[in-house]
């Protein structure tokens, strides 16, 4: 059995905590901590939609992602001249995942913008952003309903995400930065509350991985996602 930092097994998540309502001026917010990765997810509701959605009767959910300068071991420069390709890729992943939570026709022609800001980065920032952002969105929908802006509470599909890697033939759940930087392969799995996959991103780093190794990573992601879904239910 592989033993990792903090006596984690290959199948163990890092310690997780959820703090809700941490931003005074957000419509909803969540601070999610997964080990030493900490991400604050704030939701802003705008009573309009992008031009391509106008007149459709549908709402829109989008996301922005960024890291604070001291989130990493060496100062991360603010992206003042436009977002990098990596940042754009991550925030599109977050947005696609979060749009799976609801039928956009049930939220009216309004935009819910989810800002995911990484306070501390130790691997898995995009997956933590998805899980935390989804929890914050749920609270935002509840607020819209209780304040009368939404006549009916939309049916919400829980959404969670987790990383898995392959190191020396062993699948590892919820990689920290050291593990991620030395993995032979890594993957991000986004799961809906009914157990179906929303998105899977998997890349070989040191060497190609086999079909069986991919299935081992998927099985581990399924286990970790089930634990995150239980966390979601515990927050209800």
Curated annotation (Swiss-Prot):
Keyword Transferase found: yes
TM region positions: none
GO MF annotations in UniProt: 3'-5'-RNA exonuclease activity; tRNA binding; tRNA nucleotidyltransferase activity
Entry-linked InterPro entries: ExoRNase_PH_dom1, ExoRNase_PH_dom2, ExoRNase_PH_dom2_sf, PNPase/RNase_PH_dom_sf, Ribosomal_Su5_D2-typ_SF, RNase_PH, RNase_PH_bac-type, RNase_PH_CS
Enzyme Commission designation: 2.7.7.56
The reaction(s) this protein catalyses: tRNA(n+1) + phosphate = tRNA(n) + a ribonucleoside 5'-diphosphate
UniProt-listed GO biological process terms: rRNA catabolic process; rRNA processing; tRNA processing
Keyword line: Nucleotidyltransferase, RNA-binding, rRNA processing, Transferase, tRNA processing, tRNA-binding
Enzyme class: transferase
Positions bound to phosphate: 86, 124-126
UniProt family annotation: Belongs to the RNase PH family.
Record note on quaternary structure: Homohexameric ring arranged as a trimer of dimers.
Alphabetized NCBIfam families for the sequence: RNasePH (TIGR01966)
Function: Phosphorolytic 3'-5' exoribonuclease that plays an important role in tRNA 3'-end maturation. Removes nucleotide residues following the 3'-CCA terminus of tRNAs; can also add nucleotides to the ends of RNA molecules by using nucleoside diphosphates as substrates, but this may not be physiologically important. Probably plays a role in initiation of 16S rRNA degradation (leading to ribosome degradation) during starvation.
Name of the molecule in the record: Ribonuclease PH
Organism lineage: Bacteria, Pseudomonadati, Thermodesulfobacteriota, Desulfobulbia, Desulfobulbales
Gene: rph
């Amino acid at each position: 059995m592989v033993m990792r930092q903090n006596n984690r097994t290959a199948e163990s998540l890092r310690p997780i905590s959820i703090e809700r309502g941490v931003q005074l001026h957000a419509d909803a917010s969540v601070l999610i901590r997964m080990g030493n990765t900490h991400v604050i997810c704030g939701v802003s509701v705008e009573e309009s939609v992008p031009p391509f959605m106008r007149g459709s009767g549908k709402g829109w959910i989008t996301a922005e992602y960024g890291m604070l300068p001291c989130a990493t071991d060496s100062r991360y420069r603010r992206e003042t001249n436009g977002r990098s390709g990596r940042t754009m890729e991550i925030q599109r992943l977050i947005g696609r995942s979060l749009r799976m939570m609801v039928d956009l026709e049930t939220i009216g022609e309004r935009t819910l913008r989810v800002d995911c800001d990484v306070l501390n980065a130790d691997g898995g920032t995009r997956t933590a952003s998805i899980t935390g952002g989804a929890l914050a969105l749920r609270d935002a929908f509840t607020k819209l309903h209780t304040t009368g802006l939404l006549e009916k509470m939309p049916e919400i599909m829980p959404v969670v995400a987790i990383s898995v890697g392959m190191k020396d033939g062993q699948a590892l759940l919820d990689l920290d930065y050291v593990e991620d930087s030395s993995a032979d392969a890594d993957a991000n799995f986004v799961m809906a509350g009914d157990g179906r996959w929303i998105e899977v991103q998997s890349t070989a780093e040191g060497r190609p991985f086999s079909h069986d190794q991919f299935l081992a990573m998927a099985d581990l992601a399924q286990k970790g996602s089930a634990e995150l879904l239980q966390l979601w239910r515990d927050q209800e």
